[in-house]
């Protein structure tokens, strides 16, 4: 168990947000609401709520980032989600969220984040989607397995972190060391929510077969968009990436 815990720690690269950064965000985005959520174990999670929807009942997109991602960067692209509320909450240990990340904690926190936002006045529970990028694809897939979703948008996803690591280090007993980490493929066959998967044509982190395995296993309606010329960490620099997100939101 100690080896497993130590190995899992290698997955996370928490990025913090200092007080000056927080003040800068509040000044730059005056319409953004700061959010504090208490996890089931008492850990405080911090994030942002962009109210982009209109009307008495608003659709909601809940975003989960990568393993080295402080999610406030997404505020600069909130207009992509025009017509939708956008929930950006940092993993524990990231941004201004307290605690230490682990698979068990992040999956449990995803449920708390969903329940918090869906419980807010004016949020339409029938029109909630989850968006997961890289590590966040595992969190988003788990959330979609536990809560009703209008749709699931996965960016540079994997079938299982353990399988990705085994591809990268075929000479090591990765499955023995890591155990079963973020096994989205095991959850995929039971999914009924529509999936849009966005992948990079030159992803140097997630082998193409790992994304394809998840796509093939998905039980609900699905479509796959490949961003030509993109790598794992520069998808956001391609106009086609943001257009693929907009198109999914408008369906």
Task: Label every model-predicted segment.
Residues 40-116:
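Membrane-embedded segments
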Residues 1-36:
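An N-terminal hydrophobic leader/cap segment in hydrolases
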Residues 230-240:
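Catalytic histidine-centered segment of alpha/beta-hydrolase-like enzymes
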Residues 190-192, 197-203:
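Short beta-strand/loop motif that positions the catalytic acidic residue
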Residues 77, 184, 193, 207-216:
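Short alpha-helix in the alpha/beta-hydrolase fold that links the catalytic acid
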Residues 202-206, 232-233:
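Acidic catalytic loop of the alpha/beta-hydrolase fold
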Residues 149, 153-163, 180-184, 230:
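Active-site nucleophile loop of the alpha/beta-hydrolase fold
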Residues 123-134:
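Alpha/beta-hydrolase fold nucleophile elbow
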């Amino acid at each position: 168990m100690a080896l497993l815990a130590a190995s899992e720690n290698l997955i996370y690269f928490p990025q913090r947000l200092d007080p000056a950064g927080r003040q800068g965000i509040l000044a730059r985005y005056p319409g953004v609401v700061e959010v504090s959520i208490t996890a089931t174990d008492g850990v405080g999670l911090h994030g942002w709520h962009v109210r982009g929807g209109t009307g008495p009942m608003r659709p909601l997109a809940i975003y989960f980032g990568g393993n080295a991602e402080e999610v406030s960067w997404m505020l600069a692209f909130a207009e992509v989600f025009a017509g939708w509320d956008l929930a950006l909450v940092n993993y524990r240990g990231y941004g201004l969220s307290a605690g230490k990340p682990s698979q068990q904690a992040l999956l449990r926190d995803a449920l708390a984040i969903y329940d918090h936002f869906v419980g807010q006045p004016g949020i339409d529970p029938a029109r909630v989607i989850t968006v997961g990028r890289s590590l966040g694809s595992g969190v988003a897939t788990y959330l979609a397995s536990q809560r009703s979703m209008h749709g699931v948008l996965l960016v540079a996803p994997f079938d299982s972190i353990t399988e990705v690591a085994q591809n990268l280090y075929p000479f090591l007993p990765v499955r023995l060391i890591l155990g079963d980490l973020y096994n989205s493929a095991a959850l995929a066959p039971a999914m009924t929510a529509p999936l849009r998967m966005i992948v990079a044509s030159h992803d140097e982190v997630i082998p193409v077969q790992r994304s394809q395995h998840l796509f093939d296993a998905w039980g609900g309606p699905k479509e796959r968009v490949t961003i030509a010329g993109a790598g794992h960490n520069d998808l956001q620099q391609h106009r086609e990436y943001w257009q693929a997100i907009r198109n999914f939101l408008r369906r």
